[in-house]
A protein has these predicted regions:
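N-terminal "domain-start" segment that seeds a small globular fold
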Residues: 47-84
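Thiol-/selenol-based redox modules, centered on thioredoxin-like
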Residues: 172-251
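Bacterial Sec-dependent N-terminal signal peptides
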Residues: 1-25
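Short active-site neighborhood of thiol/selenol oxidoreductases, capturing the structured segment around
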Residues: 84-106, 110-112
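Structural microenvironment flanking redox-active thiols in thiol-disulfide oxidoreductases
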Residues: 107-145, 156-163
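Short N-terminal segments immediately surrounding and downstream of signal-peptide cleavage
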Residues: 21-38
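Long, low-complexity, compositionally biased polyampholytic IDRs enriched for Lys/Glu and Gln/Arg
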Residues: 247-277
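Short, internal strand/loop/helix patches
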Residues: 143-180
């Protein structure tokens, strides 16, 4: 009966705004409609040690059902000051859900802090801890001063439903990329590696992974800028020329290039795995 109610909610959100430019489906509604089926398949995949299929299931859930939904509003607590509503954040958001008992890779925080220091003018970097303020104070100095550190206490938070979805449905640490309207552009698991990695290798691994989220948010900002220009009926000739130019900064261009290299390498690795499987079958 509960599943039927959730499906009806999704259907109503889909059709109640007929004629409008866009339907805003809440993240909580979408995750509730699909998480049970995903969990069953995912648990079975990992039970059979089919890691690749488990990752495929996660990507499928995110790309087919969660991207394009809108994050529900909820209350977060800073270490000092008054509680903050998620909807009060005005910039695009790079959200990381975390807990202080999670042990980051050696190069994770240096890589994250470098990106925060470079792009905080354009992006709000939010680290949301499932923990107490006393525990967060112990790790506060490890983060850039430009990072927004918040915590959620499930025992006192009134937004229990969305908090449970963020923490328990997909797990943590997790990265969420949202535009300034709180629309989900992507969700990624925080990358992990063997503890024997050197600081340099760890930094590069995490920088490349985190850069993907930054690139997604920057690319969306560029797209919105282009759409605003296209909406103008008659652009002067100089404005048309300017529109055609690459408006990215050198740093943004470098991150995009690194992401393209990452995608190419991922494709090569996928082909190699497919060939290896084919050879094994033969």
């Amino acid at each position: 009966m509960k599943n039927l109610f959730v499906v009806l909610c999704v259907t109503l959100f889909t059709f109640s705004s007929y004629g409008q430019l866009e339907t805003k489906v809440p993240f909580s509604v979408a995750i509730a409609a699909h998480i049970k089926k995903y969990n069953a398949k995912s648990q079975n995949a990992y039970k059979e040690e089919d890691i690749e299929y488990g990752e495929f299931l996660f990507d499928s859930l995110v790309n087919n059902h969660l991207v394009g939904t809108y994050m529900d509003n909820f209350t977060m607590n800073p270490i000092k000051g008054d509680p903050v509503k998620f909807e009060e954040l005005e910039k695009p958001i790079f959200l990381i859900t975390y807990a202080t008992w999670c042990v980051p890779g050696e190069g994770e925080l240096p890589a994250l802090n470098d990106l925060i220091d470079r792009f905080h003018d354009q992006i709000d970097f939010v680290v949301l801890f499932w923990d107490t303020p006393e525990q967060i104070k112990k790790v506060e100095r490890d983060y850039s001063n430009q990072a927004h550190l918040f915590y959620v206490d499930e025992r006192t938070n009134r937004d229990t439903y969305i908090i449970n979805n963020l923490k328990h449905s997909l797990g943590f640490p997790m990265m969420y990329y949202l535009d300034n309207d709180k629309k989900l552009l992507g969700i990624e698991k925080m990358v992990s590696h063997h503890s024997s990695e050197t600081l340099s290798n760890s930094y590069n691994i995490h920088f490349n992974s985190l850069s993907k989220g930054v690139s997604t948010l920057i690319a969306n900002l560029d797209l919105e800028t282009e759409e605003e220009l296209v909406d103008e009926e008659l652009l002067p000739e100089e404005e048309k020329k300017r529109k055609k130019r690459d408006l990215r900064t050198d740093e943004e261009r470098r991150i995009d290039e690194e992401y393209e290299l990452y995608l190419r390498q991922k494709k090569i690795d996928s082909i190699r795995k497919a060939k290896a499987r084919s050879n094994a079958d033969n």
